[in-house]
């Protein structure tokens, strides 16, 4: 399966042109800048119109307008994952958002703990600690995700959040993809990541 991975478009999704072919497109959060409902609606209209067989997205810390939202009316091939999963062509995707209301309580840690053990492709907004998470001399990734990774047998982990670490890394047989499109200054677009994952 060919996956197009992007993240952290921060309201500039319509500036993306000539996206490459893929079977599935995944957006791992921060499609908004200020978190307004209007931003989210514009993103959803754009995302739903993309010409991919399946489209998956989660929310990041800039997307709080969707906290607790029940998103109805999406096309059958558009999947909003909020501490939930979906199986596509034998591969099990699971998505954990990053809402600020959860981050300031212990809810976020509990959400990570609940990631199913049979997950093939994990989608989070935050990276795991020490993996494509470095900026300004600090590793900003989640230690809870890093701990959970040891319990999983992933094929890939897709995330964003740390703009300075856009890229792909393979470690212990797992593909790690930081799909952040914007740089640290919110000015330059990076090329979306393409990863290949073997179907189950």
Where is each model-derived feature located?
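Core dinuclear metal-dependent hydrolase active-site scaffold
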Residues: 1-16, 82-116, 181-200
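Short, solvent-exposed loop/turn segments at secondary-structure junctions
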Residues: 10-11, 32, 63-64, 98-101, ...
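A short secondary-structure junction signal
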Residues: 104-107, 126-127, 131-137, 169-170, ...
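Active-site-proximal segments of metal-dependent phosphoesterases and phosphodiesterases across multiple
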Residues: 37, 117-153
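Charged helix-capping and loop-helix junction motifs
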Residues: 40-44, 78, 107-112, 137-146
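Binuclear metal-dependent phosphoesterase catalytic core
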Residues: 85-89, 144-152, 156, 163-200
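Core catalytic region of metal-dependent phosphoesterases/phosphodiesterases
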Residues: 6-88
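Active-site neighborhood of phospho(di)ester-bond hydrolases with catalytic His/Asp-centered motifs
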Residues: 5-7, 25-30, 55-61, 81-82, ...
């Amino acid at each position: 399966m060919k996956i197009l991975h992007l993240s952290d478009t921060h309201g500039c999704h319509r500036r993306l042109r000539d996206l490459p072919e893929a079977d599935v497109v995944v957006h791992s959060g921060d499609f908004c800048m200020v978190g307004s409902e209007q931003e989210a609606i514009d993103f959803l209209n754009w995302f739903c119109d993309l010409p991919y067989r399946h489209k998956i997205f989660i929310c990041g810390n800039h997307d709080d307008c969707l906290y607790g939202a029940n998103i109805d009316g999406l096309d059958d091939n558009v999947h909003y994952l909020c501490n939930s999963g979906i199986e596509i062509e034998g591969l099990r995707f699971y998505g954990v958002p990053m809402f600020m209301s959860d981050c300031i309580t212990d809810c976020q840690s509990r959400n990570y703990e609940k990631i199913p053990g049979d997950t093939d492709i994990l989608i989070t907004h935050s990276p795991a600690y020490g993996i494509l998470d470095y900026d300004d001399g600090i590793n900003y990734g989640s230690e809870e995700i890093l701990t959970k990774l040891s319990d999983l047998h992933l094929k890939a982990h897709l995330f964003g959040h740390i703009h300075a670490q856009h890229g792909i890394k393979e470690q212990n047989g797992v593909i790690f993809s930081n799909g952040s499109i914007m740089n640290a200054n919110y000015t330059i677009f990076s090329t979306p990541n393409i990863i290949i994952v073997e179907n189950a």
